[in-house]
Amino acid sequence: MTPEQAAALDSGDMLRVGVFVTDDMRFIEETARAARLDRIQLHGDQSMTCADRLSRTLGAERLIRVLWPERYPDLAALEETMNRHAASTGMFLLDAGMSGGGSGKRIGSERLRGLNAPRPWLLAGGLTPENVKETVAACVPGGVDFNSGLESEPGRKDPSRMRAALPALRG
């Protein structure tokens, strides 16, 4: 989808979120403006310099910084990284694995129990209508990010699974 196609979509109550794995600040800024993105998800190993500049030009409240808890030896190390990034992001997304996303791999949610995050955070990683309530109860995130758990095949969302997700979360 081009930025222009994204901008033409009527977002209604939904937020437009662009997911970026690049460290190219100009590309991210131009795409965010052209697509009229509400949020910018930094889903790569963007530098602190990149995140700081984007927070100044686009607004820290619009940035979602992705971190992979499995990269850290313990909760304290994850919290330390979150604290370093807190000034340049409005929210964190904690994903399973060591990088990337959409693998269907589940995050060890019990590992996040007691997390003292400096900003709101979302949980991602292998969430499905069948496991979301239990997973959320284990670590109490501010929200969830469904991806591959709602697909009938890679890259194709299943409407029935999408309809089942919210009621499953609410229990």
Positions of predicted regions on the chain:
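Glycine-rich phosphate-binding active-site loops on the catalytic face of alpha/beta enzymes
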Residues: 41-47, 96-102, 139-162
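Conserved anion-binding
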Residues: 8-123, 131
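Long, hydrophilic "mature protein body" segments
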Residues: 15, 25-27, 39-42, 134-139, ...
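C-terminal helical cap(s) of enzyme catalytic domains, especially alpha/beta-barrels
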Residues: 4-10, 52-54, 136, 147-171
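Residue-level signal for alpha-helix termini/capping positions
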Residues: 33, 59, 137-140, 170
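N-terminal polybasic phosphate/anion-binding patch
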Residues: 1
